[in-house]
Amino acid sequence: DLGVATNPDLNSQHWNPAKYSFMESKGGITANYTPWLTKLVTDIDLAYLAGYYNMGDMAGTISGSFSYFSMGAVQLVDYTGTAFQEAHPNEWAIDLAYSRKLHEYVSMAVALRFLYSDLNNGVNSSVTENSTEMHPAWTMAADVALYYRQPISLPMGDSYFALGFNLSNLGGKMAYDDGDTQNFIPANMRLGVSYELPFDDYNRLMFSVEANKMLVPTYQSKYALNEDGEALTGQQLKEWYSSISSPKGWIQSFHDAPGYVD
């Protein structure tokens, strides 16, 4: 999937909200619905609603979106593997962004997002040996995006060269228990470039390349050692991973993968 440096469209909120500043129309709205993995299951769905309003080059553009993901029916089991209830997990997010042109060819955007995840659908039953109860989790996150788009005149029409950059889901962690286990949200960095070549008034060809980097630290293996060279237990690994702050995790993700050579 790519979209951080492609042409602006109504779905730019997901890929790069800074692209909305280059939309030609005053505003717009779009709705998408995708049945997920229909050849395997029939009750997993993804819904997405997005829109924007351009207040002018000086005032900027506001945009927002709502996404909802239903995971269908899931059989819950306790720590012994015994099934006790069926749940319908779901996750949703709502966000609001503001973008503005910094230059004729450059725009920037900032987005704020509220994320909510309910993996056990409100079933607060003991699922571990220590009788830890699961609860819905939520957190806040932000995106910072840039977009550069410059026309290049050719005999057959204007071509467009574009660069896109988006740091997304920069925010806190989520806990499904009473806070003992902190889970990272999928922070991500996108960087892309595209070139659109016109053939005539009705036909154009775009070339685009995009790189993605997940900004989530790697969970160490069960053979990890502490500073004294002693093997860490499973509980110690869990506590160590939960203790990593979000900003530290973003930076650590660049060098903590297995096989990395410093």
Predicted regions and their residues:
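Subset of outer-membrane beta-barrel
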Residues: 1-262
